[in-house]
């Protein structure tokens, strides 16, 4: 088995790590960063940018720069109304009801897994550059509170990126692996994970290489983006008061506000106030307008207090579900960049009655844990066992629209559970099995993961047929369901794929698109390198012509000048093979100058060469004499 990389596919940033000599190592990207912005952009020429280069052009290209796409993974269009308001790009309803992004620069509607695949490809290439070998397998992390559709969408993204996703791991669990890799004694830890777009809390029992999740809870609509949004709303309101101009419909201004809000939030973690200066934010009949405000930490904490408080209830539920009291927890580990906010650290202390542990890097812990899980799968990380749980209950709809649960939330996975049901009407020959996920009593109030029909049931009075429904959750938290008529032995099975998810055909098409993008990227890089070589050669040849042009024949000089002109003309076009050919022609022609330079250098210093030769002979003789003297 080859190397399995660990990837933290984050809302704001992503990170990749690998096990080396039994220890996890975070890999730097080509820009030198240990994390990579989870941002994908398309330029007006249709070129795809990923990571920092995409982030650098966000302000000037807001409608074609996609960030926080994780908030849309595995979600139906009607589920993302609040998320749509937070982004400048266009989110539409896909043919199968899922949320898709319309990218005007390439005139294409793209699915969230397809966009996330671009970030995963960047992570894959980062690892390949470091290892010097091809990478095909990965462990990818997801928020613990991701439902089945969101997990499936993440696996699909990996497949599109050319990765065989060996395991989907919950982010808090991965962070606990990073924390506990060298811990030998038993302890109970809480992982409080507040990232860019999601919040998770998990309670784990660690000891003797076993990492057992006792409970998990969270909110997939809460993260650092929401904190930024509060600052943006404040700035829009204040600016409207002062200048009577509403910035809320100006996409370029909103993008600048987003950057400024994120920067101010980060500054306020270490300072009591942050200055926000955005010159030329807009203009009216009187000329340009500048935005300038000072935001204090106290004001910021007041603005975001309702968000901070929203993390409290999931924590209390997780503690209760684990059958524990807050005082039973030995350590509280903070994960995710947003846990640097002082108000968050304060509420953590309030909930758990202790100072949180800050010994784990909140930006890297999840990727490190994913790499460790990869090591467990390859056998490189020995004597370690990970026991995770399903975050939400699973069941089916039964008579009266009730949800009958087969697997309760916080059940250790993998797991399998079966229950026998019967028909609801006389002579019923088929049953529609509707698979649900959630905690509400009524089926309509929970998420429908999928449905299938078991037919061919012999006609009989209601209540007579025996239909066994089995739920099987694998180690990735992905659900498989089967229904079997006990009388005939007839069985129907499905692996749950969200009704708004991607079909196999779509995934295959996206895999091919991703591969063609890789080829395009390769050609683009080859073209840039060829142009750089050509420009460098033109510069050097022109410089040499100025110095030595008088010393070569007019015929040679004219030939070189013609070749320079031809190469400059070729640089204007896009034919790379012609460019390489013209570069080679100029290289050959310019050898005439090199010959003249060499002859000139030799002719100018014969005396110096003779002096050096004589000095060389004398020193050799002297060396001989010293050695000879020693022998006496």
Curated annotation (Swiss-Prot):
Alphabetical list of InterPro entries matching this protein:
ATPase_NBD, Chaperone_DnaK, Heat_shock_70_CS, HSP70_C_sf, HSP70_peptide-bd_sf, Hsp_70_fam
Q: Mind listing the GO molecular function terms for this protein?
A: ATP binding; ATP-dependent protein folding chaperone; unfolded protein binding
- Which signals induce this protein? By stress conditions e.g. heat shock.
Q: Which Pfam families match?
A: HSP70 (PF00012)
The UniProt keywords, alphabetically, are: ATP-binding, Chaperone, Nucleotide-binding, Phosphoprotein, Stress response
Amino acid composition bias (Low complexity), ranges on this chain? 601-617
The UniProt entry, under CDD domains, shows:
ASKHA_NBD_HSP70_DnaK-like
Residue numbers spanned by region Disordered: 601-632
- Protein's UniProt keywords contain tRNA-binding: no
Which residues are modified to Phosphothreonine? Answer: 198
Basic and acidic residues composition-biased segments: 618-632
User: SUPFAM superfamilies per the record?
Assistant: Actin-like ATPase domain, Heat shock protein 70kD (HSP70), C-terminal subdomain, Heat shock protein 70kD (HSP70), peptide-binding domain
What the protein does comes down to:
Acts as a chaperone.
What HAMAP family does the record point to?
DnaK
Question: Which family does the record claim for this protein?
Answer: Belongs to the heat shock protein 70 family.
Q: Which named protein is this?
A: Chaperone protein DnaK
- From which source organism is this entry? Borrelia recurrentis (strain A1)
| Gene from which this protein is expressed | dnaK
């Amino acid at each position: 088995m080859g190397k399995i990389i660990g990837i933290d596919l984050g809302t704001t940033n992503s990170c990749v790590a690998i096990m080396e000599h039994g220890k996890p190592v975070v890999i730097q990207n080509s820009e030198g960063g240990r994390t990579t912005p989870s941002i994908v952009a398309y330029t007006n020429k249709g070129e795809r940018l990923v990571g920092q280069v995409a982030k650098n052009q966000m302000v000037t290209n807001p409608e074609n720069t996609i960030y926080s796409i994780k908030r849309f993974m595995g979600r139906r269009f009607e589920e993302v109304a609040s998320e749509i308001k937070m982004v400048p790009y266009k989110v539409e309803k896909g043919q199968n009801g899922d949320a898709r992004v319309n990218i005007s620069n390439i005139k294409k509607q793209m699915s969230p897994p397809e966009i996330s695949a671009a970030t995963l490809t960047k992570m894959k290439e980062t690892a390949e550059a470091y290892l010097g070998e091809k990478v095909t397998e990965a462990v990818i992390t997801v928020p613990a509170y991701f439902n089945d559709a969101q997990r499936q969408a993440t696996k699909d993204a990996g497949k599109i990126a050319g990765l065989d996703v060996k395991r989907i791991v919950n982010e808090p669990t991965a962070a606990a692996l990073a924390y506990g890799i060298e811990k030998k004694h038993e302890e109970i830890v809480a992982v409080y994970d507040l990232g860019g777009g999601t919040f998770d809390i998990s309670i784990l029992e660690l000891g003797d290489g076993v990492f057992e999740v006792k409970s998990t809870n969270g909110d997939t609509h809460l993260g650092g983006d929401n904190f930024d949004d509060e600052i943006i709303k404040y700035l829009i309101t204040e600016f409207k008061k002062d200048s009577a101009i509403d910035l809320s419909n100006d996409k370029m201004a909103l993008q600048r506000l987003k950057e400024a809000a994120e920067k101010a939030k980060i500054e306020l973690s270490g300072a009591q106030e942050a200055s926000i200066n955005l010159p030329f934010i807009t203009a009216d009949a009187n000329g340009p307008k500048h935005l300038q405000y000072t935001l204090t930490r106290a004001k910021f904490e007041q603005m975001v207090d309702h968000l901070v408080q929203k993390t409290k209830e999931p924590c209390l539920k997780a503690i209760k579900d684990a059958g524990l009291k807050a005082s039973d927890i030995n350590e509280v580990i903070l994960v995710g960049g947003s846990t640097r906010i002082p108000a968050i650290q304060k509420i953590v202390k309030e909930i758990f009655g202790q100072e949180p542990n800050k010994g784990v890097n909140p930006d890297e812990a999840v990727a490190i844990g994913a790499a460790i899980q990869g090591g467990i799968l390859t056998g490189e990380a020995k004597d370690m066992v990970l026991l995770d749980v399903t975050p939400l209950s699973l069941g089916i709809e039964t008579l009266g629209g009730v949800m009958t649960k087969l697997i309760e939330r916080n059940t250790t996975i993998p797991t399998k559970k079966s229950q026998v049901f019967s028909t609801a009407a006389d002579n019923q020959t088929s049953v529609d099995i509707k698979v649900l996920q959630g905690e509400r009593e009524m089926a309509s109030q929970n998420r429908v993961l999928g449905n299938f029909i078991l037919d061919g049931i012999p006609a009989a009075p209601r209540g007579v047929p025996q239909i066994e429904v089995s739920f099987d959750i694998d180690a990735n938290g992905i659900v498989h369901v089967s229904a079997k008529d006990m009388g005939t032995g007839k069985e129907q099975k499905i692996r749950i794929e969200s009704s708004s998810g991607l079909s196999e055909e779509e995934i295959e098409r996206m895999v091919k698109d991703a591969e063609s993008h890789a080829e395009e990227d390769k050609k683009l890089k080859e073209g840039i390198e060829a142009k750089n070589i050509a420009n460098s050669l033109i510069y050097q040849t022109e410089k040499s012509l100025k110095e030595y042009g008088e010393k070569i024949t007019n015929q040679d000089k004219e030939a070189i000048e013609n070749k320079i002109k031809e190469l400059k003309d070729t640089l204007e076009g896009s034919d790379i093979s012609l460019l390489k050919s013209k570069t080679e022609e100029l290289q050959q022609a310019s050898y005439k100058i090199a010959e003249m330079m060499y002859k000139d250098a030799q002719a100018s210093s014969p005396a110096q060469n003779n002096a050096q030769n004589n000095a060389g002979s004398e020193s050799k003789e002297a060396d001989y004499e010293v050695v000879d003297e020693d022998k006496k």
